[in-house]
Structures are given as C-alpha cells and as structure tokens.
C-alpha cells in the first residue's frame, strides 16, 4: 500500500500501472476497502488503475468527528491532485457510487467518464436514515463484527465469497464504519445532477441485488441519454466479485479509449 496525506487525511491506496487511458479510479463501497475490487483487476490488465481506501476504511486514517460524502469526494480529488492526475474515469460501487457522483458534481471537467456499480442517485428515506444511525450505535457498542455478521450474507450468494467478505468487514475500523454510516445517511439527492453529465456513463447492476434494487439503476439510465446499463442475471450487490468478466467488459468498453 502507498500512503499520502491529502485534504488533511492520510489516505492509503494501491496503483496498478498500465498504458491504457484515461486512468481508472475504483472507489469501494461500505463496509469494505479497496480490496473489494481485487477480482476485477486481472480483467483490467493494461489499465492504469487507482484504488483508494476511503477515510476511515482499510488502511486510511480514521477521522475524528462527523464528515460527509462530499468530504470523502474531496479526499479523492486531493489524491488525484497529489498524483498529478488531471482527468480520470471515476467508478464507484454502492457507497463509492455516492462518492463518485459527488466528484462529478464538484469537478465535472476532471471526469472523463463515470461508472456506477450497484448504486443509486436517491438519498436515504427517513426509515433508511434511522436504520443507519441505529446500526452505527450497534457498531459503537459491539464493534465491526455486528455488521460483518448481518451484511456479508447480503453481499454475495457464493459461500466462499461470503466468508471472505465477513473477514474483510471485521477488519474495518469501527469508528470509520460509524462515520461512513452517518455520511451515507446525510447524503444529498443527486437525481437532478444526472441530466447534466456530458461524459460517458456506464451503469452495472446485478439483477439479484437485495440491497439496492436494479430499478434504481434503470431510473438513472432513463435520465442519462448517453448511459449504458449492464444488468447481470443471478448476481447480487457485488458484480465485480461475482461477475468480474462482465463488469470489466462494461467498464472497459464504455470508459477506456485505448
């Protein structure tokens, strides 16, 4: 892992060097880290790929106090600045999709294309927001294990993948998990943003996703004329893990020029 202090936060990241353009930034979801993309990397051979750990996740620093999805986006933008990456294709999975949308809101001129994997533009409903805060309270009392036990089985139908995901979630800092839950609960509605995109947009969603229904991706596609939508049968919330070939093809075809 590499580490840089950007936007006042120590951010850890991996870099797969490649010759294809533009660079591809893969932003992980909750409650994971950059390694959630590992199964996809062999299918992106030759691509220049940047994989950050968001603040409070993986090897990145845990930040005291409340923060927002916009703060997470600023971290990634600052990392691009530090690495002298002027323009990149930004891909986000689930919570990472919220961060990717915020990057597109803040610096659209630096986004060559956008990938939205198992995510949505809508904000939390009041019920979902309350549920996130209740989960954060449980994490504060019981640690990361409580989320690992409940969420890992919802991420994949493959027992081996579920076991590995449970271990990955257990490794995540409880404080960072609580911060991310609050940030997601307070994220804005990005629906009106979608029609402003002038760059290519690739949307990928598993038809068996039990966390964010595929209808959310279909709604986004309807608002982005140039967007492609790849729906993958029998795949849940993590198509990059359960269907890496199809996911990589969609991203390469839509976002990489060479």
Question: Which residues does each PLM region occupy?
Answer:
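Alpha/beta-hydrolase fold catalytic core
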Residues: 1-24, 45-48, 85-86, 171, ...
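Conserved HGGG/HGGXW glycine-rich cap/lid loop of the alpha/beta-hydrolase fold
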Residues: 7-65, 69, 79
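Conserved acidic catalytic loop of the alpha/beta-hydrolase fold
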Residues: 70-88
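Conserved hydrolase catalytic core segment
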Residues: 83-125
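Conserved alpha/beta-hydrolase catalytic His-Asp/Glu region
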Residues: 124-130, 141-196
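Short beta-strand/loop motif that positions the catalytic acidic residue
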Residues: 197, 203-205, 209
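Catalytic histidine neighborhood in serine/cysteine hydrolases
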Residues: 214, 218-237
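Catalytic histidine-centered segment of alpha/beta-hydrolase-like enzymes
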Residues: 235-248
